[in-house]
Each structure stands twice: as structure tokens, then as C-alpha cells.
């Protein structure tokens, strides 16, 4: 087994601190704003869209934005429960995305190789646990339901919050607009991103090294059973009443 570099160890420590404090709005959102990490809730925000990384965040953001006939302001991509909590407490509509924990965790470590699988698992828990008490005040969507179910998802948001967001016109043109918005978001980001971990480069898929993915999956399955059960329980709690 290779010995992690000093940079890897520092990156892991930074990730631990970041995820351990990510549910404190005043602290986490101030840090996100300073580092240009995502878009933080403000009084003019129309909706918050958040989720653990690799859970359809970019697609949900772009699908909603592309469908609108008028400009809207979306808080998104901080990957911090603080953004969700701040949105709920401000009375702003909130959409939380969730992906099955094993797939989400493996997706993250494939693009953030300094992280260990167990660290990424703790990050999943630290994202969803603090917002579980707010479950009945938000709309939740599985990541796999975002693309094909965007119209139904926006209708759920409108029904839950009394909003009037436009639903998408599912045409080749609207898909092109959505894809352009995703590309623009990834291209126009500013700031250093996460401490030491930096910015994630957009990848069209997670089809990377099959050996790396297989090792990551094996590490997930050999992680403490109590942690795996907790992540599965969180996923169940957020999705059990979804259509």
C-alpha cells in the first residue's frame, strides 16, 4: 500500500474540517463565498438546489434555469447543508438531490483521489444528517430522476412552495440550452475552490479507470458496517415517500 503524500494528508485534513463545519450557516457560507465555492443563499435567491457531489447538481441547476422565461437566482453547488438550512430558515424553496450512497461516494473519490472512501462516506453522512430534521420543509429528488423527470420535479416544487417556475419544453433546443448552461457554469467559476482539494474539472461521465473504480467499491464494502448502515438509512429516510 502506497504511503500518502504530505499534500494528500493535508487535503484529507482540510476535507474533514470542511465537512465537520458545513452545517453551520454563518461559518460555512462565509467560507464558500470567500473561496468562490458555489453560489450562496442571499435575500434575492429564488430557490436553493443542493446535494452531495456527483448527485446531479449541475443537471438540476441547468434544467430549471433553462426552462425559465424570466431570470431567476439559484443558490447551488456549495455542497454544504448550511446552504439548505439557510434557505429553509429564510422561507426560500429548497430542492435537495440524493444519490444512492455507494454510487455517490465512489463517484466523488474517482474525481478527488486524495480522499479515502471512508472520508467520502463521512462526508455523505455530514451532508444529509443535518438536513434530515428539515425533510418535510424541502423537496427531495433522486439524482436519476432529474433528467427524465424534470417537468414532474418542477411541478412538485411549484405545488410544495406555491411557486410558478416554468416547466421545461423537452425539445432538442431546450436540451442544447441546458447543456450550454452547464458548460458555462463550469467554465466561468472563479476563486480557488475547496481548500487544498481545489476545483473539480467537469467530466462528462465517471468512466475512468475500471481498476480504480473496482478498488473504491471494494473499499466501500469493507468500510465499517455501522457507517454503511447509517448511509443506507439516510438514503431511505429521504427517498421512502418519493414517487
Question: Positions of the model-derived regions?
Answer:
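PAPS-dependent sulfotransferases, especially Golgi type II membrane carbohydrate sulfotransferases
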Residues: 1-46, 165-243
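Short amphipathic alpha-helical surface micro-motifs
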Residues: 28-33, 77-79, 121-124
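The Walker A (P-loop) glycine that initiates the GxxxxGKT/S ATP-binding motif of P-loop NTPases
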Residues: 50-51
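Structural element of the ATP-grasp superfamily
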Residues: 64, 131, 208-209
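PAPS-dependent sulfotransferase catalytic domain
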Residues: 71, 80-202
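Acidic, His- and aromatic-enriched active-site or binding-groove loops in soluble protein domains
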Residues: 73-75
Amino acid at each position: 500500500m502506497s504511503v500518502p503524500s504530505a499534500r494528500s494528508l493535508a487535503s484529507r485534513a482540510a476535507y474533514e474540517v470542511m465537512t465537520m463545519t458545513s452545517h453551520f450557516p454563518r461559518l460555512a457560507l462565509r467560507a464558500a463565498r470567500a473561496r468562490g465555492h458555489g453560489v450562496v443563499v442571499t435575500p434575492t435567491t429564488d430557490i436553493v438546489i443542493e446535494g452531495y457531489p456527483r448527485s446531479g447538481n449541475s443537471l438540476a441547476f441547468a434544467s430549471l434555469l433553462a426552462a425559465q422565461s424570466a431570470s431567476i437566482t439559484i443558490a447551488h453547488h456549495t455542497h454544504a447543508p448550511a446552504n439548505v438550512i439557510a434557505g429553509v430558515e429564510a422561507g426560500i424553496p429548497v430542492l435537495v438531490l440524493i444519490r444512492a450512497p455507494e454510487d455517490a461516494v465512489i463517484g466523488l473519490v474517482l474525481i478527488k483521489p486524495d480522499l479515502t472512501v471512508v472520508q467520502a462516506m463521512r462526508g455523505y453522512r455530514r451532508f444529509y444528517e443535518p438536513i434530515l430534521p428539515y425533510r418535510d420543509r424541502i423537496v427531495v429528488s433522486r439524482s436519476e430522476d432529474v433528467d427524465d423527470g424534470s417537468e414532474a420535479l418542477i411541478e412538485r416544487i411549484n405545488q410544495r412552495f406555491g411557486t410558478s417556475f416554468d416547466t421545461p419544453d423537452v425539445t432538442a433546443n431546450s436540451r442544447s440550452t441546458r447543456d450550454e448552461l452547464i458548460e458555462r457554469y463550469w467554465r466561468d467559476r472563479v476563486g480557488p475552490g475547496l481548500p487544498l482539494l481545489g476545483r473539480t474539472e467537469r467530466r462528462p461521465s465517471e468512466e475512468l479507470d475500471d481498476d480504480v473504480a473496482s478498488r473504491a467499491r471494494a473499499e466501500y464494502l469493507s468500510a465499517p458496517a455501522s457507517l454503511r448502515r447509517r448511509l443506507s438509512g439516510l438514503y431511505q429516510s429521504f427517498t421512502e415517500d418519493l414517487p
